[in-house]
Amino acid sequence: MSPFGQQLRELRRARKLTVNQLAVYSGISSATISKIENGKRGTPKPATIKKLAAVLKVPYENLMAAAGHIQAFPEEIREASEGYQSVYEIYQTAVTRGAEHLPIFNSQKWEHLSKQDIENLSKYFDFLSSEAKKRASSS
């Protein structure tokens, strides 16, 4: 399996999509998707990658870099974006739980929040997280 094929499979599974569902939503045949995932087909064309990125809800540039069509960001930029990686991981967790549609992931909703609003949200999140942890440990 190619690294791109492996990444494609992981993204598809994280979104709980079958090969056939990804095919229907992207307009790419299920045979082509299967061949890409299993490394039996070469690197997909940018147009194919664009369709996959849209359905999988990942940045087109990330898949283009994974496929080798564009160069990945230099190390300095990657190090500077560790905070963004954390946000991406939070979003990925939401995706695996089917919650990516919630307003908390809409950046426009954040524009009107004050510092105090965000601090209150953080406190409430800490409370919810603590309660969830208690429930998990008692089950």
Curated annotation (Swiss-Prot):
User: What's the superkingdom here?
Assistant: Bacteria
HTH cro/C1-type domain ranges (all copies) = 8-63
DNA-binding positions: 19-38
Which processes are annotated in GO (biological process)? Answer: regulation of DNA-templated transcription
Annotated Gene Ontology MF terms? DNA binding; DNA-binding transcription factor activity
What's one Pfam family the UniProt record gives for this protein? HTH_31
Q: Which InterPro entries match?
A: Bact_TransReg_Diox, Cro/C1-type_HTH, Lambda_DNA-bd_dom_sf, RghR
The cross-references to CDD domains, in alphabetical order and at most eight, read: HTH_XRE
Q: Which UniProt keywords apply?
A: DNA-binding, Transcription, Transcription regulation
- Gene3D superfamilies under this entry? lambda repressor-like DNA-binding domains (1.10.260.40)
* SUPFAM superfamilies named in the record: lambda repressor-like DNA-binding domains (SSF47413)
* Name this polypeptide is given: Uncharacterized HTH-type transcriptional regulator RghRB
| Gene behind the chain | rghRB
